[in-house]
Amino acid sequence: MSRRVLLLEPNYKNKFPPIGLMKLATYFRLRGDDVVFYKGDLKEFVIHQITEECVAKLSYLDGSINWKLRSDKIALYIRYRKHEYLKQVGIEDSEIAPILEPWVEYYKKFYHSGEYKKYPRWDWVGVTTLFTFYWDITIETIEFAKLMVKDTKNIMVGGVMASIQPDEIEKATGIRPHIGTLHTPHKDIDKDNPYIIDELPLDYSILDEIDYVYPDSGAYYSYSTRGCIRKCS
């Protein structure tokens, strides 16, 4: 059975794309899992997910209308709760409008009441980290990941800051980060994992899933060395 996998990069400005998450995307897709990458406003991500569920429900109840084309208007109503946005959705175009409108109201309340926090949708969530001066936004993203995943045992926090300050991150979030690279088959992530994840090719396609544009996103990346060659004590 395929897993729903969410890969998160905190919404800080950075020049290079998240190479670690790109390798994880390759790994999970090799395993047949569904992978989503996100970098941006976390509230917008939640609204987008709830809007997708609302569109799916409306499409199931009345397939004669392409509700996906109206998803932007649905998202605006869910976010702002203004009746003018509900009118723009055009529920009255459906012959079963009295049945559909309560469902739109349901998803609006589902978001604003915080009810969605009780029903996490993701089987596995990975969070990358970078510099320590991005501490606050990184911790915020990890806390968000805890709300999104069905079991917090299936959260992996990795990257530079995670390897430098694992104890501090664990104290702040309760999540023990992964230190270093993923280089151990039959241990990293899954016991039946046959791959050295750190050596997998990068999945550049995940960069097309977000609005953020990395200045060097058009480049291809390789490693010549790992870490520092010095032996400082």
Regions found by a protein language model. Give the residues of each.
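RNA-binding accessory domains that recognize and position tRNA/RNA substrates
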Residues: 30, 74, 137
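Detector for Asparagine
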Residues: 11-14, 66, 154, 193
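Glycine-rich beta-alpha loop elements in corrinoid/cobalamin-binding modules
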Residues: 20, 24-27, 37-46, 82-218
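Extreme N-terminal starter segment of soluble prokaryotic enzymes
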Residues: 1-6
